[in-house]
Amino acid sequence: MTFRLSRFESPLIEDDGESRASLLGYSPENELYTDVDENRESRFRRFMSFISSSPYDMFLAINEHVESIDWDSKASTIAGPLGNFFTCSLYTARLLQDSLIRPNQQKLDKKRDSFDLSRSEILRKFEYLSQVPKSGVVVTHLNWYWKFLTFLNVALQITVGFLILINLFVAYKFLIGHFQVYSLFYTKTSPRSKNVTKRSLSDLSFKSLEEVTNSSLWTMIRYMFVRKRLIIKDAPKGKYYYQLRKWTPGKFYTALFSAFSPISVIFLLVTEVSFKTALAVIGHQYILFLVLFKRYESRLDDEACLAKAHFEEINEKVIKPKTTIKTQDAMVDATTYGGGAAFFPSFTTTRSHIFQTHAVTGDIITERYNPETRNFEDVENTGRAKNYISQIQGVSHGQQVVSRSKAMNGATARPQFFSRQPSPSKIGTPSIILNYRTSPFSAPTTPTLKPVNGVQNGQSIFRNSPDPSKANSLNCDTSHLSRNNTLSRLRRNSVSPTKSGNYCSASGMRAIHKSNFGADSSVSYSMEAPSNELPFEEVARRGRHPFEITASRDLPAGRSSAVSSRHSSISPFKGNTSFAGRESLDSRPPFR
């Protein structure tokens, strides 16, 4: 085991005192005595203080030593044989009393020299007394036997009394001595138990307990024996709680009580003990030990195993998935340029196995516990951000490629699309057949207007596509998708305010479609048109790249209304008329 002096120094605690003293800057020369003298004096002082201490301190020290022993583990090895020894001792004592002491009880109690005529001085004067044969040898021979029986009688009485006291102590510790009190604060209904009482919440206040302890002796006795057994029946809702007083005897006293029970003691005391009585005592010992210790304690152990298994199942299925969620502190880029997210390690989880401590020098040390090696390991670079989504070098923010299924902390991130180009499909979900990147530009403008003639028009449409390889691959006729079709979904929901008039009547360019509802003059979504007038064909050729400054001089004169219409129309289904074979992947709703 080590202790941290600094971030880079962690000496072992098992080292000698001189190395630790040198590291801490401690010099024993400043002390008045060495460690050896201190140990010698401490032993002497400890012995003197133990002798001169009060009896209560000695009792407390002995009690602490006794309570520190794990008695439950010694139930089968000590308690059972000890109880059987006590029962056998009581049976032997009662057998000797009934078979040896009781028949000679009269001889033991009376005086043996009461009728000894040889001691009388008056009878010694007569000659007749000298003719009577003397039996002094027989009396002397039996004298030690009566004395032994008298001593044995006293010893057996003391033994029986001592065994009765031990049995009373064991019965008290088993039946009354072990109880645990539980407070059921979240139980709404009364439990079906005789050991449950209804208590007031005012009894839990420190003030009430302090008042009881500082009051008279009679008040404390009344509180202990009267108030604690008071059952509150009509307490208001939320002002009471239930208290359970559970009987919890240990395995040691259970084994000792079953092997040396009060039933066998009472049976041996009230009956005349003989050799036949041993059969009843042995049978009683076996049955009681089997019922109480073997079956009853085994049942409690089995219930504990089932409760543990049930708790482990709940822990694995419910508690652990909710409390061990891997979390991180994230910093997400919320700008319109796209970008990524920076993730920082989070130390707020309850099961992160990461601890922050301070060394002797004041350095902050971050350690992580490794269950495999059972050691603490230093965690480096804990404050450095870890970018799981980073930008590709040489690609701008708008053209940043974002993973479609990036997994972050177990969740899959949805694909990001930087284009606001509306999808021509009825549903707004991305298509699964598109394998090219979306447009990096975001503007609430109408997609490219498609002329109906020429391959150049098809090429101008694919200038809107973010994939340049598609620009020269169109060699199909798209004249069947004319905008004269009023039932086409490409013109549905169009609310452009500039489509109600004949602003474009050139043949082959764009057909006039008069709205059935009249001009949408109440709501205007138009944007400012560019200062320079561009021809409509040039606008159609450029597509969504208005930053090009090279314009063809061979095209007919443009109309500013067409440019304004391009910038003001916000129809959600007017873009990408050539959707044969491909669809847009824009999953965002149309701009309205």
Curated annotation (Swiss-Prot):
It is found in: Nucleus membrane. Its main location: nucleus. Disulfide bonds: none annotated. Residues 560-571 have a biased composition (Low complexity). Residues 547-592 are annotated as: Disordered. GO terms for cellular component: nuclear membrane. The chain crosses the membrane at residues 151-171, 255-275. Keywords: Membrane, Nucleus, Transmembrane, Transmembrane helix. Signal peptide: none annotated. Member of a perinuclear network that controls recombination at multiple loci to maintain genome stability. Required for rDNA repeat stability. This is Nuclear rim protein 1. It comes from Lachancea thermotolerans (strain ATCC 56472 / CBS 6340 / NRRL Y-8284). The lineage of its organism: Eukaryota, Fungi, Dikarya, Ascomycota, Saccharomycotina.
